[in-house]
Amino acid sequence: IKERVEKTIKLVDLEEHSESNVQDLSGGQQQRVALARSLVMEPEMLILDEPFSALDAFTRAALQKDVRSIAKDLGINLVIVTHSIDEAVLMADRAVIMAGSPGQIEEEIVVSLPEERNAQDPEVQKIRGHLMETFRRVSTVEN
C-alpha cells in the first residue's frame, strides 16, 4: 500500500507536500489530493463533478492537462460533469448536453481533436460553437 501511495503522490506532483496537512495546501493542490485519493484505488473510471470550477485560470489549465495525461497514461476513462463549454471541448472525446428534470440527453457530440488542444485552434472553436448553439437551443426549449 505504501508503494502505491508514494507512486500516486508522485503522479499528481505532490511529492514536496506529502507530509503537509490538506488544509494548508492551495486550492489546486487540494484538488490534486482529491485526485490522488481516487487514483490510489486504481479505478477503471473516474467521475469528476465540476473538478476545476473553484480554481484560477492558470491552475485550472494546468490541472486539466495533467488529468487528461494521467487518465491516458493509466487507461482510465473520465466522466466529467461541467457547466463550462470551453472545459468540455478541451477535456472531452465526447460531450453530452443534458436538459430537463429529470435530466435527459439532448445531444451527444464527438470531439475528434488531437490530444494537445489549443483554445484558439479553429477546430476547437468550431466544436465550441456547435456546443454553444446546441446549449442555446436546449435552453430556449426549456424556458
Question: Where is each model-derived feature located?
Answer:
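Catalytic Walker B motif of ABC-type/P-loop ATPase nucleotide-binding domains
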Residues: 46-49
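Helical segment within the ABC ATPase nucleotide-binding domain
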Residues: 60-74
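Conserved beta-strand-loop-alpha-helix hinge in the C-terminal portion
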Residues: 100-130
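Conserved signature/switch motifs of ABC ATPase nucleotide-binding domains
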Residues: 20-23, 41
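Conserved H-loop
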Residues: 75-81
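Conserved ABC ATPase "signature" region
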Residues: 2-17, 69
